[in-house]
From Swiss-Prot:
Organism: Mus musculus
Biased composition (Low complexity): 923-937
Name of the protein in its database record: Ankyrin repeat and LEM domain-containing protein 2
Gene name, Swiss-Prot/TrEMBL: Ankle2
Topology term for the membrane: Single-pass type III membrane protein
Coiled-coil stretches: none
GO cellular component terms listed in the entry, alphabetical order: endoplasmic reticulum membrane
Length: 964
């Protein structure tokens, strides 16, 4: 028991000893911390070289160190030194930023004033005042050597960097070096010591105000240089468009106010950059003497002026531009961007933001609102060099192309700020298939870019529109797979070749290599038609189907290709494409473009062409009518002989005016049997057809018997009679006609010779029937117009003088056959003749005055089209005229004369496996990229189809070079 008690006592004593030792250790540690927290004694260094402390200054001159002076002193410290002083003062220190710095400065100043201490390690030596005002980007002002002076901080009036530095802001170090420091004691001197040292009165900063000069300042114009910042601000407000800037010397401010050395050269210039700030440091003692680039004896400089377009306001971008894009207002959109290109191109050639927060540009908004036409119009405008030249008028074409590629790439592939979605993401997400078609066809589009959630455009198809059909989703996927075309090429000898698949994603090297390997003897291949855009699999299947038609229609397609070597394979491809529902276009020379005539756009173009042709024909007829009427008036004064409406027998007699009417009729009836085979050749000539069906009675014949004369556009002197029943003697006003008998004899001889040359084309039978050779389908078209004259007869009429031509026309009118409706009195066909006269001016064909194979080809292209007479009246009239002829007659129509070579866009296709050929330059292209207008429909061949392949490859080639 005793042993146990001793053990307990020992353990208790040991525990008390340990507890006492712990308490002692804690007390010592507390005392050490208290000693560390006490401010250091700054008076222990008695040497004169060490800077005096703030406590000594306070003790020597109590009440002179104020809170403002302490705050000014602390502003000269950099963030690291300020953090050290805060820690030494025993205060908690967080991150020091531009917003929190003032809080820590104020706390530290209060603590130092309470403790009577000041900064120690951060104070610079007195020699630093004359050496440099700023060290490591921050101002450190040493105290004065004079111990009787108090220490204060000196800081510039313009502490906010970048407030008034103009267009070319200087470097931060340059601005820092431009401020001359003042000793800290100079600002905190007592009134008792102000008499000792006086500060200079000269201002430290000069403010130059630069107005907007058109051709430089006038010689006697005032130069705006101010010493007060408020005055400079007031002047800048009064002078519209001006800007001001702070300078160290008055000379620099005057140069700035005159507009000298203020503009930077264009990126295409090779001259060095001229900047008054970067060329010479403003704090240097040499001023601008070190670099003479900014000095000009005449104070003028060869500078490049920027464009005069101002940045649009945010309200205009939102209320005008974005609203026009959302509503699809193309005209308003075009007016805005062409009036100020900065609506599309912002600073740094970046897309203009039309919706802040999400940072949407025009392409984002158009893709989101399903405005495919606005996307296409935006791309076409940005790729127009003339539009970019508005922004950079001094750039050459190479620089403009680089800028265009840069801006277009940003518009197509810039993600938004919220979900990192590109315009293609928006189009796929909302199921806007037309927008996907436009965007995915561009060569600069990136189709596999991922958004914030790591999804590509293909993975977000119809995420925001779940009610879309599966067929539409499949179409979007096909567009994202690529746009492929099946082209049809033709050589100069019209031999067709179905080329390899063509896509906008193909590289240009392959086509260039094939171009170099082609032989000079190979024919030049031209693009005539193409199918697409299609997916790669569909394009390959259609190419095989086009080359080898299905067995059921193989015979029919084979007969078409053999019977029509000029456009047979186009007909086969057209029918296959329409049957499968694939886009199809072919080139038509008379329209000058690639188009599908059965589409709405094709019908509209054909309607415009026919209307223009009708107007042109009517204008020519009016000109002839005016000429004839003028000649009638001039010849009316010298007329002395009588002529009937038709050529009477008086025309065959030399001056016998007393012939009776019955003799005239008898001799007139003997003429048709002699010249029947050649009469119809004169029905329609280059000068027009004659009005038929006039009465023979001279008493009833007058000018008023031609109700349709003005409408038809003909006013022939031989068909006119004066009011007294007499005809006109001469066509000129001065010379009379030669003897009519001799003239008609010469004409008959010429016609006999001409009929021998025309015997190969037409052979009339004994009865004089010309329905099968000259007038096709006359049996089923009683009210159709007369067939146009052959080219040989037309050329013959051109070579004759006007008098002979008029007599020939009169003879043709006289010598109409029995089946030709000429004598209304005898045959009783006056109503029919009037309609024939009216319809003769409505004859309308696509090429010339007579039907040709072109009419047959266009009719075949419109076979499946539903033509509404109300919407397309001209097409309806043309089709009715062509359908009056039988199919066998239409097969015999000749091909129109080709006007030169094929002028289509010659595309460099890699057709070395299927054909050998080289492509001619694109200078003779009928569908140049520059001619593409925004009004073209989305279903017409776009800028990136084979119709514009050369432009396409050029863009891809330049983009590839830019990427390198």
């Amino acid at each position: 028991m005793l042993w146990q008690r001793l053990a307990v006592v020992e353990w208790a004593a040991l525990a008390w000893e340990l507890l006492g030792a712990s308490v002692l250790f804690i007390a010592v540690r507390w005392l050490v911390r208290r000693l560390e927290k006490r401010p250091r004694d700054l008076n222990r260094c008695g040497t004169l070289s060490s800077p005096p402390s703030a406590s000594e200054a306070v003790a020597a001159q109590p009440g002179e160190v104020t809170m403002d002076a302490m705050m000014a002193r602390l502003k000269l410290l950099n963030p690291d030194d300020l953090r050290k002083e805060v820690m030494k003062a025993g205060l908690k220190c967080g991150p020091i930023t531009s917003t929190t710095r003032f809080i820590f400065e104020k706390k530290l100043a209060q603590a130092l004033l309470e403790q009577g201490g000041l900064l120690t390690s951060s104070l610079p030596k007195p020699s630093a005042v004359t050496a440099m005002a700023f060290i490591q980007g921050t101002s450190r002002t040493p105290p004065s050597v004079d111990g009787k002076q108090t220490q204060q901080a000196c800081f510039s009036e313009d502490r906010d960097f970048g407030y008034s530095v103009g267009l070319n802001p200087p470097e931060e170090e340059a601005v820092a070096s431009s401020v001359h420091p003042v000793p800290f004691s100079a600002s905190t001197r007592n009134d008792n010591h102000k008499a000792g040292v006086t500060a200079p009165k000269e201002p430290l900063v000069y403010y130059g105000v630069c107005p907007v000069y058109e051709d430089g300042p006038v010689r006697h114009e005032r130069i705006h240089v101010y010493e007060d910042k408020k005055e400079a601000l007031q002047a800048a407000k009064l002078i519209k468009g001006s800007r001001f800037k702070a300078f160290r010397t008055r000379e620099d401010a005057e140069k700035f106010a005159r507009g000298i050395c203020d503009y930077l050269p264009s990126p295409n210039k090779t001259t060095p950059l001229l900047s008054p700030v970067k060329a010479v440091p403003l704090g240097g003692s040499d001023g601008l003497k070190a670099d003479g680039l900014c000095l000009a004896e005449s104070e003028t400089v060869n500078k490049e002026r920027a464009n005069s377009y101002k940045n649009p306001r945010t309200q205009d971008l939102t209320a005008k531009l974005r609203k026009a894009v959302e509503n699809g207002e193309e005209h308003t959109f075009s007016d805005l961007i062409w009036s100020n290109p900065r609506y599309l191109i912002g600073s740094g050639d970046n897309p203009t933001i039309v919706q802040e927060g999400c940072r949407y540009n025009v392409m984002h908004v158009a893709a989101k609102e399903n405005q495919a036409s606005m996307c296409q119009l935006t791309l076409e405008t940005l790729e127009n060099p003339e539009f970019m030249r508005l922004m950079y008028p001094d750039d050459n074409m190479d620089m403009l192309q680089k800028r265009i590629l840069y801006v277009v790439d940003l518009y197509l592939n810039t993600p938004d700020k919220v979900g990192f979605d590109t315009p293609l993401h928006f189009a796929c997400k909302f199921g806007n298939v037309d927008v996907v078609n436009v965007l995915s066809s561009h060569p600069l589009i990136v189709k596999n870019r991922k958004n914030k959630y790591g999804k590509t455009p293909e993975e977000v198809i119809c995420e925001r529109s779940q009610n879309k059909s599966p067929a539409l989703k499949e179409r979007i996927r096909e567009y994202l797979m690529g746009h492929y075309y099946v082209p049809l090429l033709r050589a100069e000898d019209t031999s067709p070749v179905i080329g390899e698949l063509w896509s906008s994603d193909q590289k240009a090297e392959a086509s260039n290599t094939a171009h170099c390997r082609s032989s000079p003897r190979d024919p030049v291949m031209t693009l005539r038609a193409f199918v697409g855009p299609l997916s790669p699999s569909k394009a390959e299947d259609f190419r095989k189907l086009w080359k080898t038609p299905p067995r059921k229609k193989a015979g029919f397609f084979h007969s078409i290709r053999k019977s029509d070597p000029e456009r047979g394979i186009e007909r086969v491809g057209r029918e296959l494409a329409h049957e499968l529902g694939y886009p199809w276009v072919e080139y038509w020379e008379f329209l000058g473009c690639f188009v599908d005539l059965s589409s709405q756009e094709g019908l509209q173009r054909l309607e415009e062409y026919l209307i223009q042709k009708e107007l042109s024909k009517k204008a020519q007829q009016e000109i002839r009518e005016n000429e004839g009427c003028l000649q009638d008036r001039t010849s009316d004064f010298g007329s002395g002989k009588k002529y009937s409406n038709s050529i009477s027998v008086g025309a065959f007699l030399d001056g016998d005016d007393d012939s009776s009417l019955e003799e005239i009729k008898n001799q007139q009836n003997t003429v048709p049997s002699q010249s029947q085979p050649t009469t119809d050749k004169f029905q329609t000539s280059k000068s027009g057809s004659l009005p038929l069906g006039q009465k023979v009675d001279p008493g009833e014949t007058s000018v008023g018997t031609y109700p349709d004369k003005g409408r038809n556009g003909f006013c022939h002197p031989l068909n006119h009679r004066t009011a007294d029943g007499r005809g006109l003697e001469a066509t000129n006003g001065e010379e009379a006609l030669p003897p009519p008998v001799s003239v008609l004899t010469q004409e008959l001889n010429k016609l006999n010779l001409q009929s021998l040359g025309d015997s190969l084309h037409e052979t009339p039978d004994k009865n004089g029937k010309l329905e099968d050779e000259v007038l096709p389908s006359r049996k089923g078209a009683a009210d159709s117009d007369l067939l146009a004259s052959p080219p040989a007869i037309a050329s013959l009429g051109k070579k004759q003088v006007r008098t002979n031509t008029e007599v020939s026309e009169a003879m043709a009118e006289m010598s109409l056959g029995p089946k030709s409706p000429q004598l209304g009195v005898q045959a009783g066909l006056e109503p029919i003749l009037s309609s024939a006269t009216v319809d003769s001016t409505k004859r309308l064909f696509l090429s010339g005055e007579e039907p040709s194979k072109l009419d047959r080809d266009v009719l075949a292209a419109l076979e499946c089209a539903n033509i509404d007479p109300g919407l397309y009246p001209a097409i309806h009239r043309w089709k009715s005229t062509v359908m009056c002829y039988s199919p066998s007659d239409r097969q015999s129509w000749p091909s129109p004369a080709l006007k030169g070579k094929f002028t289509t866009e010659l595309v460099d296709l890699d057709c070395s496996h299927s054909c050998s050929g080289r492509c001619s330059p694109a200078g003779s292209s009928p569908s140049k990229p520059g001619h593409t207008s925004s009004s073209s429909g989305l279903h017409s061949p776009g800028r990136y189809s084979p119709a514009h392949g050369r432009h396409f490859q050029r863009v891809a080639h330049v983009a590839r070079l830019a990427a390198l």
